[in-house]
């Protein structure tokens, strides 16, 4: 039984599958949906990868195949043009509307994606304060004339908690903090992400050792090029907006098409940058103490995932999840995970 004062969320949780690129999140999501279907429960996948939302960016983003989409319905794939701008705030609204719609129809949502902030934005207590160009321009001018130290002193008065954990030599963060205070009328520290579900959820993380993950990335990179990635980029390059163009691999292939880099070096560069991205993703997800880490190579992976889901549905993790915020330390963007937490 949950202890007194702990909120109990009865019923099926939203399932969120996270982990580094090439770890097998899509496959696990489909396997879980099928296993739930065997038990008489409908489930559908909600994409939480920023770049898979763009139409036509299929190969370079490792989007679910037609066969995979036929097996389990996917949402928030191919919803915007590459020329459009996608923001995490816009995604949050779309994802929460999709989740609410699915739940209202008795369908369990399974979030799948490698974009850490996007995955959290869908289910966590995260707000995204707007910007004000005039306020920002004024603060930037003050930084040029008065210096970052003066702005930092002002921040220390308006939001001591924010100033305590902020580098006084980082004017960009100081300016953003003062801008948020001016725009919202609230302390900047009050807008920071919190490890608290606003939608009852359970997070499954896929874990691999570095050598196995690197091998998967090398194989996937080769498969991308064998599958027509160069042709995909050639077709899309004139339509890529500033957000879509940041997707890893696309600019590298554009450089190849422009004759700046040969094909072998392009593939090697993409593989190396993907491995670097995977390390960053593991660092990001590793800070969240609520994630249940599962070995991606364990033959019993799906069974283990279902066991975690069943425990979550029964409320067995509620007490831990409710106190997750106490297990981490905020450094205004550098959120550290306690030692000792490892894969399940």
Swiss-Prot record:
Q: Which SUPFAM superfamilies match?
A: P-loop containing nucleoside triphosphate hydrolases
Q: Which residues bind ATP?
A: 19-26
Reactions performed catalytically: adenosine(37) in tRNA + dimethylallyl diphosphate = N(6)-dimethylallyladenosine(37) in tRNA + diphosphate
**Described function:** Catalyzes the transfer of a dimethylallyl group onto the adenine at position 37 in tRNAs that read codons beginning with uridine, leading to the formation of N6-(dimethylallyl)adenosine (i(6)A).
Q: What is this protein called?
A: tRNA dimethylallyltransferase
Q: What Pfam families does this protein map onto?
A: IPPT
Listed under subunit, the entry gives: Monomer.
What keywords appear on the UniProt entry? ATP-binding, Magnesium, Nucleotide-binding, Transferase, tRNA processing
Site positions (Interaction with substrate tRNA): 115, 136
Coiled-coil portions: none
- Please state the Enzyme Commission number of this protein: 2.5.1.75
Which superkingdom?
Answer: Bacteria
Give residues annotated as binding substrate: 21-26
UniProt record similarity statement = Belongs to the IPP transferase family.
NCBIfam families assigned to the protein according to its UniProt record, in alphabetical order: miaA
